[in-house]
Amino acid sequence: MDGSRRVRATSVLPRYSPPCLFTGHLSTKSNAFCTDSSSLRLSTLQLVKNHMAIHYNKILSAKAAVDCSIPVSVNTSIKYADQQRREKLRKELARCEKEFKLSKSAMQTNSKMNSKFFVNSLQKPSGEPQDQDVFIEEMTRYPSFSKSLIPSSEGLHLSLPESSKMLMSGTQKHASTSPSRHSGCGHGCDRRPRSAHQFQVALAKTPSGDLLEKHSDLFSNKQSPFTPRTLKTEAKSFLSQYRYYTPAKRRKDFSDQRMEAETQTELSSFNSELGTAEKTSSKDSEVNINQVPNYTRNGAEDKIAPLPSQGQNLAWDSIQDGILQQSSERASCKLSTEFSPDSKIYSDEEELLYLSFMENVTDEILKLGLFSNRFLERLFERHIKKNKHHLEEGKMRYLLHGLKVDLGCISEEDPAKQKHFRMLNQLHFQKALISRENEFVSDEETVSHHERQQYQEALDMLSAVPKDENKMFSLPGEFLIPAHKVKHSEGVIIQQVNDETDNEASPWNENNPSVSDSVIDQETSVDVIEGDSDFERAETSRELCCLSTSLSPSGPFPSINGGSNHGKELSTLRIMGMSIED
């Protein structure tokens, strides 16, 4: 029994223990709890050792009642294999990040030493000989230089600050004078492997800060303020199709305005241009006499009477009563034409409205304190839009144009454009001045035009002589008026009066069938009567022109071949009526 137990015990001895006897602290002999003398024997110690080994083997070989091992399907699953591979890659990335951080900190600590060493090497005089192989070997001692070599000295491009760039340019000049040094460097560099990276010096990074400080060489004008630019496109928003969407209003582009900063709040920039603008405005303020309307208003009568023709070429000062005066040099911001108090077209109330309009504009400019051209254009357009329903837009624009001249906003570079703008405003304002008068003048002009036309037609009809085309003989003292159709014609009455007649009767015979002229110095009087054009249109035909010729009493004509008309007396001519169709 003991033998079999001993053999069994020896069969389960642990693999990690040597088969030799226990000595030293492993035996129970040196144990403080050993009190029995029998335990000091070697056989007892071996039995205890075997017993404990068997006990631990049983514990390690024990199995759970529930199988918790990994199933076979998991090991054969592709999804599980991909999951394990991703976990492995994640661990590798974490390890690489740790190594990169450590190397980065080491590079930062050594960067200053590297830069100082390289700058000192560049500052050496060109006369001293320097071995390029030794120089490269010294630089490869540092970790920042160990990964980069250069195939030739001509490919050396370093990212240095401006001071280092100046030194680098100096060394390149000295290197060009000594070609032997380049050849030596080329032979020395050819010994290096071709797989090496390009040589670069790792300097300290640019310190964090403003872009203007980092890249100051890329910005030309640092004093100009930052003005964001918006992309102007003709594309329309999709929301414009929505019934409740109100699109943004586009600003009108003025071609003659100058681009200035919105934040300009001082008048110092306008002081230099103010004197020159006054000189140019005084020259442009001269008004051409031909452009001024040749009409004046009478105080007693509400009619327009044209000025005499010889007064058109006179100067402004020669016109009496102060109706029109020559504009002064500072009249660029005022009206170019002035009227006397008795011939004013605009009332005092309207002038007060214009004065209040200019006062509101100037008050808002002074309140905001902005004097840029863009701001002034916006302000003027807003006030014009606000007051255009009860004030003349042309006069408002002319007054605002004068205000811009006073502020010096109009440059002297384009005097032609300035003069053209002033002439347009003057014409617009003059058109507004005579807009009311044209209503009264229009009827009178049409009437006078028709009168002149009908008078000329009557004279043409009187001077017309019957031709052969009529194929008829006219009686003495009778003449025919050809039919003439005139639209909207007036009524004309023509009378032929005999001032002097011959009392003696002229003989009538076959040889001389015509009657001798018994009428001397006949006068023809033409009376022009105004007619109503509307009434003429209503009637389709009307007798407008009547011709009557009266002769003084004369002797009877002698009979022709003893005819019955021997005692007949011709006193008057027949009245011919001519109907003029519309």
UniProtKB/Swiss-Prot annotation:
Lineage top rank: taxon: Eukaryota
Keywords noted in UniProt: Cell projection, Cytoplasm, Cytoskeleton, Sensory transduction, Vision
InterPro entries: SPATA7
Tissues in which the protein is found: Expressed in the retina (at protein level). Expressed in the choroid region and retinal pigment endothelium, within the photoreceptor layer (at protein level).
GO cellular component: a single term: axoneme
Subcellular location: Cytoplasm, Cytoskeleton, Cilium axoneme; Cytoplasm, Cytoskeleton, Cilium basal body; Cytoplasm, Cytoskeleton; Cell projection, Cilium, Photoreceptor outer segment
GO BP annotation list: microtubule cytoskeleton organization; photoreceptor cell maintenance; protein localization to photoreceptor connecting cilium; protein localization to photoreceptor outer segment; visual perception
Pfam families: HSD3
Biased composition regions of type Polar residues, renumbered to the chain: 169-181, 262-274
Residue numbers spanned by region Disordered: 167-192, 251-289
Result of knocking out the encoding gene: Viable and fertile with no gross morphological abnormalities. Knockout mice show severe early-onset retinal defects and progressive photoreceptor cell degeneration. Significant and progressive reduction in response to light, accompanied by progressive thinning of the outer nuclear layer from P15 to 7 months, loss of Spata7-interacting proteins at the distal CC, and destabilization of the photoreceptor distal connecting cilium (CC) microtubule core.
Function summary: Involved in the maintenance of both rod and cone photoreceptor cells. Required for photoreceptor-specific localization of proximal connecting cilium (CC) proteins RPGR, AHI1, NPHP1, NPHP4, and RPGRIP1 at the distal CC, a photoreceptor-specific extension of the primary cilium transition zone. Maintenance of protein localization at the photoreceptor-specific distal CC is essential for normal microtubule stability and to prevent photoreceptor degeneration.
SUBUNIT field: Found in a complex with CFAP410, NEK1 and SPATA7. Interacts with NEK1. Interacts with RPGRIP1. Interacts with RPGR. Interacts with NPHP4. Interacts with NPHP1. Interacts with AHI1.
Name the record gives this protein: Spermatogenesis-associated protein 7 homolog
Annotated source species: Mus musculus (Mouse)
